[in-house]
Amino acid sequence: MDTPLTAVETRVLGALIEKEMTTPEYYPLSLNALTNACNQSSNREPVVDYDEATVISAVESMRKRSLVRAVQQSGSRVTKYRHLASETLGLTEHQAALMCVLTLRGPQTLAELKTRATRLIDFESLDDVETAMNQLMARESPPLVTRLERRPGQKEARYAHLLAGEVADDAPEPAMGRTASSSSADRIGQLEQGLDDLRKEVADLRSQLESFRKQFE
């Protein structure tokens, strides 16, 4: 892209793509619903606390760049918003899902991307994820994804989106001399984190449903 997106714009775009894929019955999103989607605690790294003024400012900027469109649905006075990422950036549905996960959760390995994109769209294998990522990296106008250099102690390379410009690899250095028991503890920790994410996601969905209902009261 000619001008990199801001952190807020990146979060807005990711949230819109996510909601289109996971809860199409509530999409497009009102400003309130979009703000809640940006701020939800599940499937977000980092978790943010934007107000509506911050979100609408990002939306207006993205409208000028043909990344977001305002829509007025029949019978409703509430303006809603949908993304135009697939059209403007030329993304397939699978590529859009990967860009969504990258914008919402930062740099990730292929395995992490496959696991986290499952709730958006199905990838049959890790090779399918890698193929889609290679396509995003091979674009000439310009590439949307980069592969970060593998750091000492890491088995897999991580990938990051380039919508906000070049990426600074500031992940903490991995601990050296890891044992089998520490790896097992990590796996248990990841499972526990996954369960916690699911609980938070259910709570966020309930909150969004309540906000949606209030629009008709």
Q: Model-derived features: where do they sit?
A:
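Short, amphipathic alpha-helical interaction segments positioned at domain boundaries
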Residues: 74-77, 82-112, 157-186, 190
